Amino acid sequence: MPCHRSHMDYLLLTYSIYHLGLVPPHIAAGINLNFFPAGGVFRRSGAFFIRRSFAGNKLYSSVFKEYLSQLFIKGYSVKFYTEGGRSRTGRLLPPKTGMLAMTLQAMLRGIDRPISIVPVYIGYEHVMEINTYLKELAGNDKKGESVLGIFKAIKNLKNYGRGYLNFGDPISINQYLNEQQPDWRESIHPTDVQKPQWLGPQVANLADKVMVNINSAAALNAVNLLAMILLVNDKHALSKPKLIAQLEFYLHLQRSASYSDKVTTPNESAEQLLEHALKLNKFDVISDEFGEIIAINDKEKTLFNYYRNNVLHLFAVPSLLALHLFKAHKTTMADCQALIARFYPLFAKEWFLHELDENYITRVLASFVDQDLIEIEGDNIKITNSNDCLAKLEMLGRALSLTLQRYAIVVGFIQTSSGIEREELEHESQVLAERLGTLHGIKTPEFFDKKVLVGFISSLREQKLITETEQGLTGSNELCEVYLYLKALLPARVWQSIDDIVQSQAQHAKD
């Protein structure tokens, strides 16, 4: 079950599996890809085409379930994309659970062989459809796949860099059900398979676990690392020496304090990675008497945001710690742990993160010490007195800036509008995010994406930071803590801008 970045995923994964000496899987593909001549090629490569929706067609659904069951009974592996479609933002999409539910229902037929799910992370230094994604995010309708599109793609072929394929920790469905639903075998019937009450919740939990394991196997590369650095800088540009220094910082951080042991980090040096990235002709190089400046063209900012989103979750905790250290200059281990404990559950919901490793914070801070950015004496932590140290921590801290601003909009509105209805909060938060984006030139699509905002509000409820009653939504004391943290972490001018917008909108709603 891979993530879905591009139509190239079909070929890359199948090709890799074949060259590992394994039997390529049957592939569930959207019916939109069944056109001449691609359809025949895909079908001969193992694809079977399915409709986007089975709603209202019980016969089609029943026939497909039987087909899927027969594949499993005969021991064939099956590949399907749990996101249901290609991500247009670079973030993992919320999982679609239909195929996974059918897989579990097939097990309830009494299949006498174990079934395992293998989560797969796929990443690229260039996604062929990226310009199409940007047009769709800008509001253009999605165009159907066609022969003309194939010829255009062939015509535009060039050095697209490297593709990355990482296998996450496999999940044994039998073992999962034994642990989570010990009585699942009582629902087994060879012909008359029903939907037991536990099926829906267990499918949802299993789907989330798959997504967590995909993101735990992310691949860092030259393009997404440079995007992480350049996008947070003014004019999206940085001198070559400073860029290399920050890149070295990130490489050391990920090698010594990786979010997961499945994450892959390039073996090359910072200079080699930059040289490779420049060969892809994605970055502008501006030379003057002081040296070279590496820049992202302003028109392509959204494009690079896609690549940054592939790996932003790997920097979530280090970025929050760096921002806290930059703002406070002095802190304690207890304060760092309290900060991460408050925000990590929110990050985990948004980016499909695994449970926090109790040693992760210590490893990140130790990496900062190794690079002479901070000093630790007992429980006390302070940053070293150098401009270079401040610049590196500030740059890393900025990686979470837009995420925290989005949080501040929602939390601020709840704090000033106690009793607001959930639907109104979702709508008003999107309006406020769009306004803030206009004022500050924020063009990142997910900043004001309603689905992302709705997901955050759901996360607040799950964490019991808000309660929903007949009188509307009410924030808890813990939500006040989040509010105060955000106020301390965000730049004063940004916070003031958010606060002004929230207060104005709240007053407008009352009137």
Named regions from a protein language model:
Residues 1-511:
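Membrane-interfacial terminal anchoring regions of lipid-handling membrane enzymes
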